[in-house]
Amino acid sequence: MPRPGRMTTERAKDFKGTLLQLVRTLGRYRLSLVTAIVFAILSTFFNIAGPKVLAKATTALATGWIAKLRGTGSIDFVYIGRILLFLLGMYLLSSAFSFIQGWLMTGLSQKVCYDFRRQINEKINRLPLAYFEKRTVGEVLSRITNDVDTLGQSLNQSITQLITSVTTMIGVLVMMLSISPKMTLIALLILPVSLALVLIVVRFSQKYFKAQQAILGVVNGQVEEVYSGHNVVKAFNREAVVLNDFNAANDKLYESAWKSQFLSGLMMPIMNFVGNLGYVAVAIVGSIFAANGIITIGDIQAFIQYVKNFTQPIQQLSQVSNMLQSMAAAAERVFEFLNEPEEDQQADPARRADPACIDGQVTFSHVRFGYTPDKTVIHDFSCEVKPGQKVAIVGPTGAGKTTMVKLLMRFYDVDSGSITLNGHDVRDFDRSALREGFGMVLQDTWLFKGTIMENIRYGRLDATDEEVIAAAKAANADHFIRTLPGGYQMELNEDASNVSQGQKQLLTIARTILADNRILILDEATSSVDTRTEQRIQTAMDRLMEGRTSFVIAHRLSTIRDADLILVMRDGDIVEQGTHDQLIEVGGFYADLYNSQFEDVVE
């Protein structure tokens, strides 16, 4: 089992570029976004106007109280009551607009998450196999779960707070200037200090937010890998090793998350301290102005409240900066995934071949291929396969057997040479049309959560129940299926662990039989089953392969002695080819392989 935990190298992040790309993405939701912004501004406007209206009530109360003490008048409670009722209406409208804005932004953020998940899921189907072979499953899943969730949550909160904070700052500034420009100047002295502190913290914390998102994908990959292979871990007593690997990755996640959250957490205490200094200065100067009759008591009360309201959006902007960093880190990982190079799904229209012409004739002509430019796996592979032939590809591990199948199905394209089907290069077929011509039974069986009937029908979705049952009978699977609880309607769990490995193999063969493809590929199809089950499988496969071109890849040479053609591969080249009897008679590399497995039979 490979040791998990190796982190892929992250290229430099583009914070501004990611935000611009995200803004362009939000363009399709402009109506909801603009409406939410309008309601956010309206809600903020009524909140801003509140202290100024309340100032009139405060002034009327103070003036009336002084007049009452002097015996020259009384408190006008009717006037004050009307002001308070008007103020209550303003705050109710503000709350209603805030509720509508929140409802719109929640819907918008969820739509964005929905669309990103859909795009990622569609993208997965268009990515080349090489992408997944270089990454862990958990890392890919992290894009569609953690990154998209982080993006949606940050988007929902950051846009609203950003608009509200900016609107509040502008509105409060206007109201403060209308009360006292001198006191406003004193209050504004805290702004450059606050802004400088925010920029410093953002600069130092951004790299840790990026690292946090990256290592989170690695941790997910480890958890997924260990969970899927927990039987192997326990069998080899590797719990301690796995735990150490996980702890190493978890320590990195803890370190990056702690630093990012600690630095971002410094913003609020610092901002509160700076804001309180400004608040004290304004209170002292305002008291002096009020004592000298420059401004009214109500205006002092309103101004002090505005100062508090002015520092609050600055603090909110510091929180928004944290959310924007987290959102940008997640969004860039999503955009990186969506911008990955895709397979060419469509062939050149000028040369496009009709998949109906595929009848099983396959020609490999001087094929050369390497997974990387500096390491060639297939050097010079040539072979002619006639329709209906059973072709066995044998050789030691690393000889290139499975690679040839990947090239045949265009999971990869050859570096040089060609592979043709009935004279047409495989690159002249649309990928989906080409792959519909192949049926595969892999060594690693894949069954999804669902009924046995649904799993077999996956080979041909429009198949009737009778056709599914017929395919199961042909694969010698009908008997054991009927003995299971529920029969064909039995529900397989997530990893199909409620059936045996041999039964899984029979179900995948039944699925391939149902697909009824012209070319069949068997990759170690019977290597994980007992002898009796293997005999049943072999009987079913012999019936299936009649009239179809079949490629059989196996180390167990007993399964391919009746092959029409055996290709013996070694170090990426065909070193021998012929029937079983011919190759045994030659006494070459194939004979050595065979004798090493069946020495008692040869003797």
PLM regions with names:
Residues 2-10, 110, 118-142, 146-148, ...:
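Short intracellular "coupling" helices and adjacent cytoplasmic loop segments at the cytosolic face
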Residues 17-18, 26, 105, 125-170, ...:
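Juxtamembrane loop-to-helix connectors within ABC transporter transmembrane domains
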Residues 28, 129-130, 148-155, 159, ...:
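An intracellular "coupling" helix at the cytosolic face of ABC transporter transmembrane type-1 domains
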Residues 28, 32-45, 157-211, 282-295, ...:
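Transmembrane helices of ABC transporter permease
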Residues 33-97, 178-182, 293-297:
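Transmembrane helix-loop-helix hairpins at lipid-water interfaces of multipass membrane proteins
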Residues 41-49, 91-99, 151-154, 158-170, ...:
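Hydrophobic alpha-helical transmembrane bundles that constitute the permease/transmembrane domains
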Residues 64, 175-189, 259-333, 337-338:
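Helix-loop-helix
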Residues 355-603:
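ABC-type nucleotide-binding domain
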